[in-house]
Every structure is written in structure tokens, then in C-alpha cells.
């Protein structure tokens, strides 16, 4: 979008205060963003966060056999602590990949909320 221009982004604390050309503010740190993109955080509008614990578990199976034979029997055994640590892992992965907001659709929503 700004291929031929130098664009400055002034950040104060954790907040973007101003974006534009030739900004002049005191800086503790200056980063060269050449050949980089600045984008807003991603939003994951549908997740089952604690299911990160089931990643790769029967992933070669069709949906219904996978649910009936692998997922539902094991979900029935999940404890509050299992959901907590699965959701915590999911949150760390989402943060690492730029997700800033998510909507979880899994069991024990208050446990997932405790993670955040």
C-alpha cells in the first residue's frame, strides 16, 4: 500500500497513537519495518480451545466415526484440569499466531475464561 513511502507508527505503551509520514516523537526503540506488514490482530470466531489436546487423534478418520469412537468417549473422561490445560495451550498458540480475540464453543466455558 505504501511501497514508495516511509510510514511511521508511534506506539506509546501498548497503544498505537499515530500513523503517518514523518512523525517526530521521542523513541526508546526504533524498528525497521521494511518489507513487513502491520495488520490488526486476528479474531477466531469459532473454536473448541481445549480440543487442542486431541490434535492428531484419529485425524485420518471420517467425521462421525472420529466423533463417536475417539472424541466423545474421551471428552466424557475430561476433568476440569484437562479443559484448563487444553485451553491454556490453545491460548498460547493463538497468541503466537496473532489471534487477539476468540469465541470458545466448548464444555466448561468458565474454566476456559479462567485461562484468559
Show the residue positions of the predicted features.
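Active-site gating loops and adjacent loop-to-helix segments of metal-dependent hydrolytic enzymes
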Residues: 53-85
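A generic hydrophobic-helix recognition signal that picks specific residues
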Residues: 34-41, 91
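N-terminal metal-binding scaffold of metallo-dependent hydrolase/deaminase domains
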Residues: 1-26, 36
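Divalent metal-coordination and catalytic microenvironments
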Residues: 14, 35, 46, 98, ...
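Conserved beta-strand scaffold positions in the cores of enzyme catalytic domains, especially
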Residues: 28-32
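Active-site loop-helix segments enriched in His/Asp/Glu that coordinate
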Residues: 76-116
Amino acid at each position: 500500500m505504501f511501497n514508495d513511502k516511509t510510514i511511521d507508527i508511534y506506539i506509546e505503551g501498548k497503544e498505537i497513537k499515530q500513523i503517518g509520514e514523518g512523525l517526530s516523537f521521542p523513541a526508546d526503540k526504533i524498528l525497521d519495518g521494511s518489507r513487513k506488514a502491520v495488520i490488526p490482530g486476528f479474531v477466531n470466531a469459532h473454536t473448541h480451545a481445549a480440543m487442542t489436546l486431541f490434535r492428531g487423534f484419529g485425524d485420518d478418520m471420517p467425521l462421525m466415526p472420529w466423533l463417536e469412537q475417539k472424541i466423545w468417549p474421551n471428552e466424557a473422561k475430561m476433568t476440569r484440569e484437562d479443559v484448563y490445560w487444553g485451553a491454556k495451550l490453545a491460548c498460547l498458540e493463538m497468541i503466537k499466531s496473532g489471534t487477539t480475540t476468540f469465541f470458545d464453543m466448548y464444555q466448561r466455558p468458565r474454566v476456559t475464561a479462567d485461562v484468559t
